[in-house]
Regions:
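Active-site and substrate-binding clefts of carbohydrate-active enzymes
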Residues: 62-245
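Structural motif corresponding to the C-terminal cap of alpha-helices
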Residues: 14-21, 175, 179
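Catalytic domains of cell-wall/extracellular-matrix polysaccharide-remodeling enzymes
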Residues: 16-67, 188-216
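N-terminal start-of-chain detector that recognizes signal peptides
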Residues: 2, 54-58, 160-163
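Glycine-rich phosphate-binding "P-loop"
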Residues: 1-16
Length: 245
């Protein structure tokens, strides 16, 4: 891996963030959670205080992290904090088999009237050259591989609310269990690509809206927090050398 290439990419990312948000970023979600030992030096040079990586990047670190991925660790030599992605909450959302987006109530991404309807009917709405394209209008929900049932937005919205409650309940129980033996406030790091919400998972923004409201109004066990806020409240953390991720 060319360090200068990595340094240039990080520099561009920091510069772009500052141009958009008007301030320098405090941390970074490394592309595809990729980390190579020594990259934390480059991040520190860029003024970044923390980064997110996959669970094994923390779990396979040396020495082994006392709290697993449920507390950040500091990189030896630089002091840059490393947050490992939580496996359980990631699976609940990202898994193509067990994840929420695959529920039969949700809109089917791969069926679009640009390909489903008769060519003469759809011709005015597709590519000027006559090539069929996705129009964004989708009539079906995720049911079977061939015969699909019609999409019902009200049913999908109810399911999004239900699954937001399920996600919150699981995090509550997860936090209660972890705090019981950690005796330190654990953190559940749950990062998701923005393209999931509204693109692959059409109801994703609704689910996220329900989840945030439920966490704020419906319980008192967990709360939303950023990595920066967690580090300010919990500055004492283990020092390790993260593994390749």
């Amino acid at each position: 891996i060319c360090r200068e290439s990595v340094r240039a990419q990080v520099k561009v990312a920091v510069s772009h963030y500052e141009a958009v948000f008007g301030r320098k970023p405090r941390g970074i979600w490394l592309p595809e959670c990729g980390y190579h030992p020594g990259h934390d030096e480059i991040l520190k040079e860029a003024g970044l205080r923390y980064f997110l990586t996959d669970a094994h990047g923390v779990l396979h670190g040396a020495p082994r992290p006392k709290y697993g991925c449920f507390a950040p660790v500091y990189c030896r030599g630089t002091g840059v904090a490393c947050f490992g992605r939580d496996l359980d909450s990631s699976k609940q959302v990202w898994s193509s088999i067990d994840g929420y987006p695959g529920d039969y109530s949700y809109r089917e991404f791969y069926r679009d009237i640009g390909f489903d309807l008769d060519y003469d009917y759809i011709r005015p709405y597709i590519h000027p050259d006559g090539v069929r394209i996705n129009t964004g209008i989708k009539y079906y929900r995720i049911t079977g591989s061939d015969n699909k049932e019609s999409y019902n937005p009200h049913l999908a919205r109810e399911k999004a609310a239900q699954q937001a409650g399920n996600f919150m309940f699981n995090r509550e129980k997860q936090i209660e269990y972890l705090y019981g033996f950690m005796q330190k406030k654990p953190i559940i790091v749950s990062p998701y690509d923005a393209e999931l919400f509204g693109h692959w998972w059409y109801e994703g923004p609704q689910w996220l809206d329900f989840l945030i409201r439920k966490i704020i109004f419906d319980q008192k066990t967990i709360r939303l927090i950023t990595p920066t806020e967690y580090l300010l409240e919990n500055p004492r953390n283990q020092v390790i050398t993260p593994s390749l991720s």
